[in-house]
Amino acid sequence: MLFFGLYGGLETGVKDRTSYVLGQDKIRLVLTTPLTESSPINDHLRKHGDGVKVVALWVDDARSAYHETIKRGARSFMEPTVESDEFGEVVRSGIYTYGETVHVFVERKNYKGIFMPGFVEWKSDYNPIATGLKYIDHMVGNVGWNEMNTWVKFYEDVMGFVNFLSFDDKQIHTEYSALMSKVMSNGNGRIKFPINEPAEGKKRSQIEEYLDFYGGPGVQHIAIATDDIIQTVSLLKARGIEFLSAPPSEYYKAIPERLGQHMEMMKEDIAKIEELAIMVDADEDGYLLQIFTKPQQDRPTLFFEIIQRMGAKGFGAGNFKALFESIEREQAKRGTL
Protein backbone atom coordinates (compact mmCIF):
# COMPACT_ATOMS: atom_id res chain seq x y z
CA MET A 1 0.00 0.00 0.00
CA LEU A 2 1.29 3.44 -0.89
CA PHE A 3 1.22 6.41 1.44
CA PHE A 4 -2.22 7.68 2.42
CA GLY A 5 -3.58 10.42 4.66
CA LEU A 6 -6.69 11.00 6.78
CA TYR A 7 -7.98 14.02 8.66
CA GLY A 8 -10.07 14.47 11.79
CA GLY A 9 -11.12 17.86 13.19
CA LEU A 10 -13.86 20.46 13.29
CA GLU A 11 -15.25 19.43 9.90
CA THR A 12 -15.62 15.81 11.06
CA GLY A 13 -17.27 16.63 14.38
CA VAL A 14 -14.15 16.66 16.57
CA LYS A 15 -14.23 19.93 18.52
CA ASP A 16 -11.14 19.90 20.75
CA ARG A 17 -8.30 18.74 18.48
CA THR A 18 -7.11 18.29 14.92
CA SER A 19 -5.45 15.03 13.85
CA TYR A 20 -3.78 13.84 10.68
CA VAL A 21 -3.25 10.12 10.07
CA LEU A 22 -0.16 9.22 8.04
CA GLY A 23 -0.14 5.68 6.70
CA GLN A 24 2.20 3.46 4.74
CA ASP A 25 1.67 -0.30 4.49
CA LYS A 26 0.90 -1.42 8.10
CA ILE A 27 2.11 1.81 9.75
CA ARG A 28 -0.35 4.32 11.21
CA LEU A 29 0.95 7.53 12.79
CA VAL A 30 -1.60 9.97 14.20
CA LEU A 31 -0.33 13.56 14.60
CA THR A 32 -2.56 15.60 16.90
CA THR A 33 -2.67 19.25 17.99
CA PRO A 34 -5.09 20.87 20.49
CA LEU A 35 -7.70 23.44 19.45
CA THR A 36 -8.42 24.86 22.90
CA GLU A 37 -6.22 26.22 25.67
CA SER A 38 -7.88 23.96 28.23
CA SER A 39 -7.16 20.78 26.25
CA PRO A 40 -5.19 18.13 28.17
CA ILE A 41 -3.04 17.84 25.05
CA ASN A 42 -1.73 21.34 25.83
CA ASP A 43 -0.63 20.19 29.29
CA HIS A 44 1.25 17.30 27.72
CA LEU A 45 2.94 19.56 25.14
CA ARG A 46 3.99 22.13 27.74
CA LYS A 47 5.73 19.48 29.81
CA HIS A 48 7.10 17.11 27.18
CA GLY A 49 7.15 18.89 23.83
CA ASP A 50 6.38 16.75 20.78
CA GLY A 51 6.42 13.05 21.57
CA VAL A 52 4.45 9.82 21.74
CA LYS A 53 1.38 9.93 23.97
CA VAL A 54 -0.59 6.89 22.74
CA VAL A 55 0.74 3.48 21.73
CA ALA A 56 -2.30 1.70 20.26
CA LEU A 57 -2.59 -2.09 20.35
CA TRP A 58 -4.99 -4.07 18.15
CA VAL A 59 -7.02 -6.52 20.26
CA ASP A 60 -9.94 -8.89 19.68
CA ASP A 61 -11.91 -7.57 22.66
CA ALA A 62 -11.17 -4.06 23.99
CA ARG A 63 -13.60 -4.47 26.90
CA SER A 64 -12.01 -7.70 28.09
CA ALA A 65 -8.46 -6.31 27.65
CA TYR A 66 -9.37 -3.27 29.73
CA HIS A 67 -11.12 -5.07 32.58
CA GLU A 68 -8.43 -7.77 32.81
CA THR A 69 -5.51 -5.31 32.92
CA ILE A 70 -7.33 -3.12 35.46
CA LYS A 71 -7.94 -6.20 37.60
CA ARG A 72 -4.20 -6.92 37.43
CA GLY A 73 -3.31 -3.44 38.70
CA ALA A 74 -3.22 -1.12 35.68
CA ARG A 75 -4.28 2.53 36.03
CA SER A 76 -7.22 3.51 33.82
CA PHE A 77 -6.80 6.01 30.98
CA MET A 78 -10.18 5.50 29.30
CA GLU A 79 -13.02 3.07 29.92
CA PRO A 80 -14.38 1.06 26.97
CA THR A 81 -15.90 3.50 24.47
CA VAL A 82 -17.84 2.72 21.28
CA GLU A 83 -17.45 4.99 18.23
CA SER A 84 -19.47 4.37 15.07
CA ASP A 85 -20.21 5.64 11.57
CA GLU A 86 -21.58 4.20 8.32
CA PHE A 87 -18.70 1.67 8.20
CA GLY A 88 -19.45 0.06 11.57
CA GLU A 89 -18.09 0.52 15.06
CA VAL A 90 -14.75 0.62 16.86
CA VAL A 91 -14.34 -0.11 20.58
CA ARG A 92 -11.44 1.55 22.40
CA SER A 93 -10.18 1.43 25.98
CA GLY A 94 -6.86 2.38 27.57
CA ILE A 95 -4.42 2.13 30.47
CA TYR A 96 -1.35 4.07 31.56
CA THR A 97 2.16 2.67 31.27
CA TYR A 98 5.47 4.46 32.13
CA GLY A 99 5.31 8.24 32.58
CA GLU A 100 2.23 9.71 30.92
CA THR A 101 2.36 7.25 28.01
CA VAL A 102 -0.76 5.16 27.48
CA HIS A 103 -1.71 1.94 25.72
CA VAL A 104 -5.05 2.16 23.94
CA PHE A 105 -6.70 -1.17 23.09
CA VAL A 106 -8.45 -1.00 19.70
CA GLU A 107 -11.12 -3.52 18.65
CA ARG A 108 -11.91 -3.25 14.92
CA LYS A 109 -13.63 -6.55 14.08
CA ASN A 110 -16.95 -4.80 13.37
CA TYR A 111 -15.48 -1.92 11.36
CA LYS A 112 -14.98 -1.87 7.57
CA GLY A 113 -13.59 1.66 7.15
CA ILE A 114 -9.97 2.51 6.38
CA PHE A 115 -9.18 3.77 9.90
CA MET A 116 -11.71 4.97 12.50
CA PRO A 117 -14.90 7.01 12.85
CA GLY A 118 -14.30 10.76 12.86
CA PHE A 119 -11.77 10.73 10.01
CA VAL A 120 -12.07 11.52 6.31
CA GLU A 121 -9.64 11.17 3.43
CA TRP A 122 -7.05 13.95 3.19
CA LYS A 123 -5.18 14.76 -0.02
CA SER A 124 -1.73 16.17 0.73
CA ASP A 125 -0.27 18.95 -1.40
CA TYR A 126 3.16 17.45 -0.75
CA ASN A 127 2.43 14.56 -3.15
CA PRO A 128 4.05 11.98 -0.86
CA ILE A 129 5.56 8.81 -2.29
CA ALA A 130 6.11 5.55 -0.38
CA THR A 131 9.67 4.84 0.77
CA GLY A 132 9.41 1.09 1.38
CA LEU A 133 8.55 1.28 5.09
CA LYS A 134 6.47 -1.75 6.16
CA TYR A 135 5.55 -1.92 9.85
CA ILE A 136 6.67 -0.92 13.34
CA ASP A 137 9.31 -3.43 14.42
CA HIS A 138 9.68 -2.25 18.02
CA MET A 139 9.20 0.79 20.23
CA VAL A 140 11.69 1.74 22.95
CA GLY A 141 10.82 3.39 26.26
CA ASN A 142 13.16 5.31 28.59
CA VAL A 143 12.44 5.21 32.34
CA GLY A 144 14.18 6.72 35.36
CA TRP A 145 16.91 5.44 37.65
CA ASN A 146 16.11 1.98 39.08
CA GLU A 147 12.66 1.92 37.43
CA MET A 148 13.32 -0.61 34.65
CA ASN A 149 12.50 -3.72 36.68
CA THR A 150 9.30 -2.10 37.98
CA TRP A 151 8.06 -1.69 34.42
CA VAL A 152 9.32 -5.11 33.39
CA LYS A 153 7.12 -6.52 36.16
CA PHE A 154 4.21 -4.35 34.93
CA TYR A 155 4.44 -5.82 31.44
CA GLU A 156 4.77 -9.33 32.85
CA ASP A 157 1.99 -9.15 35.44
CA VAL A 158 -0.47 -6.75 33.79
CA MET A 159 0.06 -7.32 30.07
CA GLY A 160 1.22 -10.95 30.11
CA PHE A 161 4.45 -10.16 28.23
CA VAL A 162 7.76 -12.02 28.65
CA ASN A 163 11.32 -10.75 29.03
CA PHE A 164 12.71 -11.58 25.58
CA LEU A 165 16.27 -10.20 25.95
CA SER A 166 18.32 -8.34 28.58
CA PHE A 167 21.38 -6.10 28.34
CA ASP A 168 23.35 -4.66 31.27
CA ASP A 169 25.79 -1.78 31.59
CA LYS A 170 28.72 -4.10 30.83
CA GLN A 171 27.25 -4.68 27.37
CA ILE A 172 25.90 -1.17 26.71
CA HIS A 173 28.56 1.38 27.54
CA THR A 174 31.11 3.77 26.12
CA GLU A 175 34.03 5.54 27.75
CA TYR A 176 31.62 8.11 29.16
CA SER A 177 28.18 6.62 29.74
CA ALA A 178 26.14 3.44 30.13
CA LEU A 179 22.60 2.14 30.26
CA MET A 180 20.65 -1.06 30.90
CA SER A 181 17.79 -2.48 28.86
CA LYS A 182 15.25 -5.31 28.93
CA VAL A 183 13.08 -6.26 25.96
CA MET A 184 9.46 -7.18 26.67
CA SER A 185 7.43 -9.09 24.08
CA ASN A 186 3.93 -10.50 23.75
CA GLY A 187 3.25 -14.21 23.23
CA ASN A 188 3.76 -14.34 19.46
CA GLY A 189 6.72 -11.95 19.45
CA ARG A 190 4.96 -9.46 17.18
CA ILE A 191 5.03 -6.67 19.79
CA LYS A 192 8.44 -5.75 21.22
CA PHE A 193 8.97 -3.04 23.83
CA PRO A 194 12.59 -2.56 25.00
CA ILE A 195 12.77 -0.58 28.27
CA ASN A 196 15.93 1.43 29.04
CA GLU A 197 17.19 2.96 32.27
CA PRO A 198 20.36 4.97 32.97
CA ALA A 199 23.47 3.44 34.54
CA GLU A 200 26.43 5.07 36.26
CA GLY A 201 29.01 6.66 33.97
CA LYS A 202 31.52 9.48 33.81
CA LYS A 203 29.12 11.82 32.00
CA ARG A 204 25.40 12.25 31.31
CA SER A 205 24.02 9.37 29.24
CA GLN A 206 21.56 9.67 26.36
CA ILE A 207 18.86 8.27 28.69
CA GLU A 208 19.49 10.99 31.27
CA GLU A 209 19.43 13.64 28.53
CA TYR A 210 16.09 12.29 27.29
CA LEU A 211 14.56 12.24 30.78
CA ASP A 212 15.71 15.81 31.43
CA PHE A 213 14.32 17.26 28.20
CA TYR A 214 11.17 15.14 28.00
CA GLY A 215 10.34 15.77 31.63
CA GLY A 216 10.19 12.11 32.65
CA PRO A 217 9.78 8.63 31.16
CA GLY A 218 8.48 8.19 27.62
CA VAL A 219 8.99 6.64 24.20
CA GLN A 220 12.59 7.17 23.06
CA HIS A 221 12.40 5.84 19.53
CA ILE A 222 10.23 4.01 17.02
CA ALA A 223 11.88 1.34 14.86
CA ILE A 224 10.29 0.87 11.44
CA ALA A 225 11.01 -2.16 9.24
CA THR A 226 11.87 -2.16 5.55
CA ASP A 227 12.72 -4.91 3.06
CA ASP A 228 15.34 -2.74 1.31
CA ILE A 229 17.15 -0.42 3.70
CA ILE A 230 19.49 0.94 1.03
CA GLN A 231 16.59 2.15 -1.11
CA THR A 232 14.60 3.41 1.89
CA VAL A 233 17.48 5.37 3.43
CA SER A 234 18.48 6.79 0.05
CA LEU A 235 14.92 8.07 -0.47
CA LEU A 236 14.68 9.47 3.06
CA LYS A 237 18.02 11.27 2.80
CA ALA A 238 16.98 12.76 -0.55
CA ARG A 239 13.93 14.20 1.25
CA GLY A 240 15.94 15.83 3.99
CA ILE A 241 15.87 13.29 6.82
CA GLU A 242 19.04 13.62 8.92
CA PHE A 243 20.66 10.50 10.33
CA LEU A 244 23.35 10.04 12.97
CA SER A 245 26.94 10.22 11.76
CA ALA A 246 28.66 7.11 10.43
CA PRO A 247 30.95 4.90 12.52
CA PRO A 248 34.68 5.07 11.62
CA SER A 249 35.89 3.21 8.52
CA GLU A 250 37.36 0.45 10.72
CA TYR A 251 33.79 -0.50 11.63
CA TYR A 252 32.98 -1.37 8.01
CA LYS A 253 36.25 -3.24 7.47
CA ALA A 254 35.23 -5.52 10.35
CA ILE A 255 31.80 -6.42 8.91
CA PRO A 256 32.90 -9.82 7.48
CA GLU A 257 34.25 -10.81 10.89
CA ARG A 258 31.12 -9.52 12.65
CA LEU A 259 28.78 -11.44 10.34
CA GLY A 260 30.79 -14.67 10.32
CA GLN A 261 28.85 -17.45 8.56
CA HIS A 262 26.08 -15.02 7.62
CA MET A 263 28.46 -13.07 5.37
CA GLU A 264 27.74 -15.62 2.62
CA MET A 265 24.06 -14.64 2.51
CA MET A 266 24.67 -10.89 2.61
CA LYS A 267 23.53 -9.29 -0.65
CA GLU A 268 24.09 -5.64 0.25
CA ASP A 269 27.21 -3.85 -0.99
CA ILE A 270 29.44 -2.87 1.96
CA ALA A 271 30.69 0.26 0.18
CA LYS A 272 27.09 1.44 -0.29
CA ILE A 273 26.27 0.62 3.33
CA GLU A 274 29.25 2.70 4.47
CA GLU A 275 28.27 5.55 2.14
CA LEU A 276 24.81 5.68 3.76
CA ALA A 277 26.18 5.17 7.33
CA ILE A 278 24.08 2.01 7.82
CA MET A 279 25.20 -0.36 10.59
CA VAL A 280 25.24 -4.17 10.41
CA ASP A 281 25.07 -6.86 13.09
CA ALA A 282 24.38 -10.58 13.34
CA ASP A 283 23.09 -13.18 15.77
CA GLU A 284 22.66 -16.94 15.53
CA ASP A 285 19.55 -16.57 13.35
CA GLY A 286 20.86 -14.16 10.72
CA TYR A 287 21.90 -10.54 10.29
CA LEU A 288 20.28 -7.12 10.39
CA LEU A 289 20.92 -3.63 9.06
CA GLN A 290 19.92 -0.51 10.95
CA ILE A 291 20.30 3.26 11.04
CA PHE A 292 19.00 5.95 13.39
CA THR A 293 17.72 9.44 12.68
CA LYS A 294 18.58 12.52 14.66
CA PRO A 295 15.77 13.77 16.95
CA GLN A 296 12.83 14.85 14.82
CA GLN A 297 11.83 17.84 16.96
CA ASP A 298 13.64 20.66 18.77
CA ARG A 299 14.08 18.77 22.04
CA PRO A 300 16.63 15.90 21.88
CA THR A 301 14.01 13.26 22.63
CA LEU A 302 12.08 11.18 20.07
CA PHE A 303 13.90 9.71 17.08
CA PHE A 304 13.36 6.90 14.56
CA GLU A 305 15.22 3.76 13.56
CA ILE A 306 15.07 2.10 10.15
CA ILE A 307 15.73 -1.64 10.37
CA GLN A 308 15.95 -4.52 7.91
CA ARG A 309 16.00 -8.01 9.40
CA MET A 310 17.56 -10.83 7.44
CA GLY A 311 16.66 -13.56 9.92
CA ALA A 312 18.16 -11.86 12.99
CA LYS A 313 15.87 -11.57 16.02
CA GLY A 314 18.10 -9.31 18.12
CA PHE A 315 18.54 -5.55 18.33
CA GLY A 316 22.05 -4.96 17.05
CA ALA A 317 23.97 -5.57 20.28
CA GLY A 318 27.22 -5.50 18.32
CA ASN A 319 26.38 -1.96 17.23
CA PHE A 320 25.62 -0.55 20.68
CA LYS A 321 29.06 0.98 21.23
CA ALA A 322 29.27 2.57 17.75
CA LEU A 323 25.69 3.84 18.03
CA PHE A 324 26.09 5.39 21.45
CA GLU A 325 29.39 7.02 20.52
CA SER A 326 27.56 8.61 17.58
CA ILE A 327 24.80 9.82 19.92
CA GLU A 328 27.45 11.19 22.31
CA ARG A 329 28.97 13.20 19.47
CA GLU A 330 25.55 14.83 19.00
CA GLN A 331 25.26 15.39 22.77
CA ALA A 332 28.67 17.08 22.77
CA LYS A 333 27.45 19.48 20.04
CA ARG A 334 24.42 20.30 22.20
CA GLY A 335 26.54 20.69 25.34
CA THR A 336 24.51 18.02 27.14
CA LEU A 337 27.06 15.20 27.50
Question: Model-found features: residue ranges?
Answer:
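Short, structured motif recognition centered on aromatic/hydrophobic residues
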Residues: 22, 29-31, 41, 51-55, ...
